[in-house]
Amino acid sequence: MFISSKRLRERNTFFREDGTPLQYTLVNTKDWCKNEYEVINQLRMNTRNSFQRYDVIILINGLPIVQIELKDHGISPRRAMQQIIDYKNDVGNGYTNSLLCFMQLFVVSNQSRTYYFTNNNNQHFNFNADEQFLPVYQWADENNNKISNLEDFSELFLAKCKLGKMISRYMVLVASEQKLLIMRPYQIYAVNAIMNCITENRGNGYIWHTTGSGKTLTSFKASTLLKDNEDIEKCMFVVDRKDLDKQTREEFNKFQDGCVEENTNTDSLVERMLSDDYADKIIVTTIQKLGIALDPKNRNNYYEDLLSLKDKRIVFIFDECHRSQFGENHKAIKEFFPKAQLFGFTGTPIFEENATYTQITGEQAQYKTTKDVFQKQLHSYTITNAIDDNNVLRFHVDYFKPEESDCLQSEAHRKRAIAETIIKKHKAVTSDYRFNALFATSSINDAIDYYNILKTIIQNGEDLNIACVFSPPAEGNKDIMQIQEDLEQERKDNEIEPDKKKKALETIIKDYNKQYDTNYSISEFDAYYQDLQQRIKNQKYSNSDYARKNKIDIVIVVDMLLTGFDSKYLNTLYVDKNLKHHGLIQAFSRTNRILNDTKPYGNILDFRGQQEAVDTAIALFSGEKDPEQARQIWLVESAEVINKKYKQAISELRDFMSSYNLDFKPSEVVNLKGDEAKAGFINCFKEVQRYKTQLSQYTDFEQPLIVSEAQADYGLSNELSEDELSAFRCVYLDLAHELKLKRDNNKKEYTDPIIENLDFEFVLFSSALIDYDYIMNIIAQYTSSPSKIKLTKEQLISLVASNANLIDERNDIIAYIESLEGVNGRTEQEIKEGYNVFKNEKFAKELMNIADRHKLSVASLQSFVKNIVDRKIFDGDKLSELVAPLDLGWKDRTKKETAIMTDLIPLLKRMAEGQKISGLSAYE
């Protein structure tokens, strides 16, 4: 797919019979309206075992470029997405062995809801317990109003010239990831606004695009389009920190290999600014290097060297246009380059209302507003728009005001109470430790205090990994001084008792080294800081190569990480720090990156009762005239409202069971007859689970992982005990597995639409806490002293059976649990070893049965399977060798290979223990 996408756009050479070359492109990307466009309906193509039918395909110059799959009203377009992925997984599909490999875009619609997304490799789409998707978009107008109706979408997106421009200009090939990207509507409008401003030479401008909206891709596309503008001498992309310089260069070069080179120092920056090389037309640099280059007092005379560029048209694009350093350099840039045009990106503009700040000296100072610096706003895409588009999450804010008695206590007592509350709430807000959290404190001293308090609490039994980061005293170190330029509080704090803070940071890093088997020191602070950031991002569950002991639960910060840091696995911010205006929005926005349904919102636990500051920030940055309407978009519903919906979903499930004359019991679900009834249960119960998942992250309610019926739901609802809910989850997963197999194995032309349109949403039934190690530990406790364990053998089995992340291995674990006799005093390690022996014996028996069923040599089959499991790669040639002794004709051999793999795939997945086997999807 990726190679075909490159070939579609690049210039190719064809040699005529007389040896003369003819250069051509498959698609005209310069003058896209001159391409030939055609539409075909209901194309049918055979695969190895069946066939596929595509609703609508749009051809450009005879090549299939856009596929459109349509569903009836009321059926989720997600089913059309899944159908496309099923098509791509089918053995011998057209996307791998026909011109369909040139497919660029998919459009799915049920007439009233229309989405589009790029064609990509299968690993980027997953409809199971890890459920993560590539970006799926809705088109929108310039004011960010969504265009959902299919007819309106077709007119605005699929018209010949508009589609041609989208394919030619607004798609990006990421070579390092072998991935195809398409720009979002607001990114396209922003690029066009910048380009028009430059073409017409209409001065400066700024783009207000919220944090997390992908401004790097927007600026990259603007820069690359400027590269071909002969009137522009240079395009300078300016960032304000060394780490962002590296990060931005890597992002730009990811989008286009070799796009920008590193400026190791100001010498190399000036050299590239003076270069006529086409490769040096786009330059990424820091504001600090640029400031030095334009300083007439600098002893290296860079100022004199650059005078030849003084009257050239140079475009400056600023990564974050209201950083403290920007104001100091703005005047120098405008004075030196009078013909320059300046464009800024910001997620939180400076308005009159938030322009005042306190200097370190204690005096009041004034930012220039974003409009003062950049003249006019060219486009906006606010956090309100992003939340409404599901590009970022809403916020769930809990305010914890101190009790009157606490106010009378010492500061140490208050901090201890806050730390204990954090420990108490952390499991719930992070969805059983699936996610991690930042803890924002008001000073370095507070960060140190909280670190020590939390460490003390953890030593008394809590299983949490705590880290802390703040900048050390600079002591003349230029790298640290640069890091601290935007860390106002940390810079101020380090002026008082610097040795004490340095010693505390050394202890923190030493603890970090011990926890994570690293070897950092305060002299390598940047390396420590980078490792900590990566560890937060590596929280991904489940990841068998990244054990829980390597993960971070809570990182205590002062200023660091509260701006510019993104991780989809960070979902909570604890706050004991005064925040307001853009600082508040930036800090809150660390929590709201989209993942899947297990992360419904970003959690904010504020221990300073700053509701007024939150309301003010929402009103200021929402872009809405009605602050109350903005609040409803930004903030999630209360626990009481979600609980009401949860109870309503249970009531609807009860009514559904009653409509089939069945008691409201998990054991009765097996008596549902027919696919329609089973599908009805799937749709009803997953809504119960959806609201349960949301409620589990509300700190207003505390829910243990396992509760008895007497403890049922801690007041959430009296309608389902935790045991009953777990039992319903078990039957849901059994039924979902049954219907999914039926759908996957149904290769007939007319698939039952009731099953075809089901969306199982397995992600709602997975737990980050309940993994292999957790279960083995519980079994060890049970076999050692069942009288002391909180759950029965039956509850333990139910626990395993009701979690989707154990779905491939749950039958083996359950069989092992049932095989265990009472008290035998085994350790956890002995339990694991015993389970492995049990499992391997079970695997061996199953392999013998498969070999017998297909008349294969047991030894040959064992060798074939071992090769796959060891290498995590399926080799089709090895399968042919396995079947060769049967001496079958081509058609019978193909059938036999498919039958063998149908039997083997479930076993191979269990043996792979959650790791992906490359190439196996062809038989799934």
Positions of the model-derived regions?
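Catalytic cores and motor modules of nucleic-acid processing enzymes
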Residues: 203, 228, 233, 246, ...
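Conserved helicase motor
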Residues: 43, 213, 239-242, 263-272, ...
